[in-house]
Amino acid sequence: MTVVVIDVVGLTRRLLPHMPALRSVADAGTCATLDTVFPALTCPVQSSLLTGSLPRQHGIVGNGWYFRDLGEPLLWRQHNALVGGEKVWDALRASTPGATVANVCWWYAMGAATDWTVTPRPVYYADGRKEPDFYTNPASLHDELAARIGGFPLFDYWGPTASIAASRWIVAAAERILARHRPDVLLVYVPHLDYDLQRYGPDGPQAAAAAAAIDIELTPLLEACQERGDQILALSEYGITAARRPVDINRALRRAGLLAVHTQDGMEYLDPWTSRAFAVADHQIAHIYVADPAEVARIRGIVKELPGVDEVLDTDGKAARGIDHPRSGELVAVAEPDAWFTYYYWLDDTRAPDFARVVDIHRKPGYDPVELFFDHAGPRRAKLRAATALARKKAGLRYLMNVVGLDASVVGGSHGRLPDSADDAPLLICSDPTLDKDRIAATEVKDLIVDLHRRVSC
């Protein structure tokens, strides 16, 4: 039997009533509040779930950070070597030699010592084209899945066309691996709730509809697990809360004479090498990197006065939150509950770099949820530009998919700070009723997975 760990992104008590299949697992088993880690972001929390440690130990301080040795802010790296500490698969094999693990789309999948790996990986052609694809290990799994369920729907995974199709594909891949390969532990990442809850917030009809939709997609997998006697562990890294106040932290640093840019072809680019301070914005937290230690206190005061900023963590504050790691900024800003940080650093939109208006998660020096929308300044024109660019792409011509706007006020929800309400905290649902806990720390989940495997193996 298998321990099936399903990361249902954004799952909270507020949404569970709209999810009858998951609710039935909770009713028959255990439903607990997951005490997440700070920052409550995808990569740090997943790393804590799988290592049983805090960011100060595993080193994943955000979805990205300033790589000081490279002089570049980089987000959404994929190699597992970035994550420090013992991983759950190492602990599992120490407990049960020969135990097997499959990872379907949890982050930092590449290079991990799992037995089966599936993760999004586009094809980057030499002529600049980007085409949907995915990476697997073993390599033969790629063709097996492609023949069975088709290619990975990359443009449904992120961007203005993000939809249920990506999660449907991921669940189908998980079902295939479970049925054919029967791993001892199966990790599955299901991102669908991330989309409309960031677009519209958690309180409207779109959130309820998204919860119901992903529950339908999960139902066959849950039923198959129940029939086989598998252990189901469904959880989330964070809850998404209403947040409609963007905070332009880098623009404030620039106006204070601290952030520097360089210009090419009329476009401004962040210059981290000569900046006295800049921020890597990541939802509701921002790592602020300060070149001169003597300026840290003054810069903290500047950022603390910005509307929408709740806290600015210094050395002691970072230690108290478990994020005192060399990759962290000298300061870490935390937004107020209804606010979030943009990465924008230009002061005139006509000087914005061309990547600002496209979906480009790797070139932007911070997270950009506005990528989930067609340009609100003219959505019809944006869709027409998309159609024109697609036609040029198919014709083998150069194209620019410039469909993303620069109006951050369109975003409806965010996450990253620790939850202020139990209704907004992430959940952990387990099919085993003997777990019998009201709260479980994210750092306890690694040991819980190993323990659940012992139970199903007996």
Predicted feature residues:
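Active-site-proximal N-terminal segment of extracellular/periplasmic enzymes that hydrolyze or transfer
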Residues: M1-C31
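Residue-level preference for the first positions of well-ordered beta-strands
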Residues: T2-V4, D184-L187, Q231, E330
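Secreted, luminal/periplasmic, and some membrane-associated catalytic domains
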Residues: V8, A40-L41, W65-A81, G85-E86, ...
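Catalytic-core regions built around general acid/base machinery
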Residues: A21-A28, V88-A91, A210-E227
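Short, solvent-exposed turn/loop segments enriched in Gly/Ser/Thr/Pro and often Arg
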Residues: T33-S53, V104-A113
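His/Asp/Glu-rich, glycine-adjacent segments
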Residues: S53-G201, A213, S275-V280, Q284-A291, ...
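Short glycine/proline-rich, acidic loop/turn segments that cap or connect secondary-structure elements
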Residues: L186, V410-I429
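C-terminal helical/tail subdomains of lipid-metabolizing enzymes
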Residues: D436-H453
